[in-house]
């Protein structure tokens, strides 16, 4: 607010022609050198700027890598559950340089899930499932299904 008032008053004084603007030009001249404003020499300021740019690039690279890892996870889940692919995720992975893998923790979880699914899909897994099921329940289900089929056949065919 004070800056706004100062600039309005100094503009009015300049317009009157009293020459009040010459002091302001000297103040602005000192502020045009950012190194002096920061209290550093020119070399220190340039080094500081380089360091800031490098840090920003590192942060951007890490951010892009994280985004690509998340996109890779989404792609993996889409493949696993047979969902449609997303071009946005593919683009994020390509932007990261196609050198993106799942984080190690997630990779371990995925590998464990795959092993469990393979065990369930194998013949031994099916046999274990049969052992875990109650034989009486299986027998009742089979008899109910047979009775239902027999009744349906009797309704459709008068010979039976």
Swiss-Prot record:
Family stated for the protein in its record: Belongs to the complexin/synaphin family.
UniProt-annotated stretches for the region Disordered: 14-51
Protein's organism: Homo sapiens
Location(s) in or outside the cell: Synapse; Cell membrane
Entry GO terms, CC: plasma membrane; SNARE complex; terminal bouton
Subunit-level organization: Weakly binds to the SNARE core complex containing SNAP25, VAMP2 and STX1A.
Lipid attachment site numbers (S-farnesyl cysteine): 157
Keywords: Cell membrane, Exocytosis, Lipoprotein, Membrane, Methylation, Neurotransmitter transport, Prenylation, Sensory transduction, Synapse, Transport, Vision
UniProt cross-references to CDD domains, sorted A to Z: Complexin_NTD_CPLX_III_IV
Protein name, UniProt field: Complexin-4
Post-translational modification (record): Farnesylation mediates presynaptic targeting and is important for function in neurotransmitter release.
Keyword Membrane: yes
Function: Complexin that regulates SNARE protein complex-mediated synaptic vesicle fusion. Required for the maintenance of synaptic ultrastructure in the adult retina. Positively regulates synaptic transmission through synaptic vesicle availability and exocytosis of neurotransmitters at photoreceptor ribbon synapses in the retina. Suppresses tonic photoreceptor activity and baseline 'noise' by suppression of Ca(2+) vesicle tonic release and the facilitation of evoked synchronous and asynchronous Ca(2+) vesicle release.
């Amino acid at each position: 607010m004070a800056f706004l008032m100062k600039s309005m008053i100094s503009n009015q004084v300049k317009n009157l022609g009293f020459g009040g603007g010459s002091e302001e030009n000297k103040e602005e001249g000192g502020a045009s050198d950012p190194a002096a404003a920061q209290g550093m020499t020119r070399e220190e300021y340039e080094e500081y700027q380089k360091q800031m740019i490098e840090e920003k690039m590192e942060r951007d690279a890490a951010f892009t890598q994280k985004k690509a890892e998340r996109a890779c996870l989404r792609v993996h889940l889409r493949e696993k559950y047979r969902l449609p692919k997303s071009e946005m995720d593919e683009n994020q992975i390509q932007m990261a340089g196609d050198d993106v893998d799942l984080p190690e923790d997630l990779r371990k979880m995925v590998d464990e899930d795959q092993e469990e699914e393979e065990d369930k899909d194998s013949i031994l897994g099916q046999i274990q499932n049969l052992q875990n099921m109650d034989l009486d329940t299986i027998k009742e289900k089979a008899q109910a299904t047979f009775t239902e089929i027999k009744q349906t056949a009797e309704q459709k065919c008068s010979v039976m």
